[in-house]
């Protein structure tokens, strides 16, 4: 199993290109099932999750083609893919495929909307009553779907097509909003989503669907209106920049020190996180086509955060920010309100010398003068990259095991950091 070795202490200086957002690319790829024409997606990151979804779509009969590189493209600048669902042969998504990635459950929406039926495995580990897919199922039922749970599968049918309806989500759900957008795009009549997710990735999906012929208004606000159409067309769409990757590298610079331009990204995608970083002492400025992050000397100020749905502080940056706070001057409080069990990185950061105390959904971080490298183990995607950030600032060598988690969400991480002066290498098993 691959490992990453980091020798800490080197500041980061240079330019890091930001990839297309995985969390936007996944629903965009799934939306290809809504039409028999070709959907061309530009700036799709090369990630394990993208490859997994490609296999899942292929199981349904979707043709996949990677377009040749344009002049100046590298393996770090994303890929252009063409997806054509003109010959869908199967509306069943089996457990062995869906279990590799939870987002793949979303195929239930376009399959049901276009073909009138779908049989999709529940993601692994879902217990009745606490399934994270409950709100997605609720949205489809509001649109007229007949749904039953049978032997671990969600079986969805509609006799005469989906019908527009008002869907009021009891809590903000990105997945539920994605599913409702795709299903309602081909429903009869008008659908209104209340308390819809406002994330940039939701806006990106709506913009792509509109290019395909959908009629969606209000994406990016809590109220979205979708006027259903009879069919959707092919389209060409560029995936928006990855705000989580942007914030991750910004926090790496804030922790290790240095001067880095994050290019091909947008500050408006993560204002809350950048504002917090500025408060810690990092200097954040917008430059043409990107963001410049500097921290040359001076300590790291302790700052309290609470994770919230967009436009609040992203839960997907919580672990990275906690790594930064381990070297802050004073005490910081980090409250996680989006997901349970999202403090799995705490005990691994402690192996590097961090002082963190947990009280329910609150982590209390006492800043220390230094971290010291040690062997650590990645437990999930965001936790794994928080260990990378900590390792960059720690004294000595940090060895990160189970780095396959990183490959799910960070494209060419070692190459991007290495070119900015980080002493980082992957040791292949």
From Swiss-Prot:
Its main location: cytoplasm. One of its GO terms (molecular function) is UDP-N-acetylglucosamine 1-carboxyvinyltransferase activity. GO terms for biological process: cell division; cell wall organization; peptidoglycan biosynthetic process; regulation of cell shape; UDP-N-acetylgalactosamine biosynthetic process. CDD domains: UdpNAET (cd01555). SUPFAM superfamilies: EPT/RTPC-like (SSF55205). It is found in: Cytoplasm. Keywords: Cell cycle, Cell division, Cell shape, Cell wall biogenesis/degradation, Cytoplasm, Peptidoglycan synthesis, Pyruvate, Transferase. InterPro entries: Enolpyruvate_Tfrase_dom (IPR001986), Enolpyruvate_Tfrase_sf (IPR036968), MurA_subfamily (IPR050068), RNA3'P_cycl/enolpyr_Trfase_a/b (IPR013792), UDP_GlcNAc_COvinyl_MurA (IPR005750). The active site is at 126 (proton donor). It is an enzyme of class 2 (transferase). Its EC number is 2.5.1.7. UDP-N-acetyl-alpha-D-glucosamine binds at residues 102, 131-135, 316, 338. GO terms for cellular component: cytoplasm. It comes from the Bacteria. It catalyses: phosphoenolpyruvate + UDP-N-acetyl-alpha-D-glucosamine = UDP-N-acetyl-3-O-(1-carboxyvinyl)-alpha-D-glucosamine + phosphate. Pathway: Cell wall biogenesis; peptidoglycan biosynthesis. The modification 2-(S-cysteinyl)pyruvic acid O-phosphothioketal is found at residue 126. Phosphoenolpyruvate binds at residues 22-23. HAMAP family: MurA. Cell wall formation. Adds enolpyruvyl to UDP-N-acetylglucosamine. NCBIfam families: murA (TIGR01072), PRK09369.1 (NF006873). Belongs to the EPSP synthase family. MurA subfamily. This is UDP-N-acetylglucosamine 1-carboxyvinyltransferase. It comes from Methylobacterium radiotolerans (strain ATCC 27329 / DSM 1819 / JCM 2831 / NBRC 15690 / NCIMB 10815 / 0-1). The lineage of its organism: Bacteria, Pseudomonadati, Pseudomonadota, Alphaproteobacteria, Hyphomicrobiales. The gene is murA.
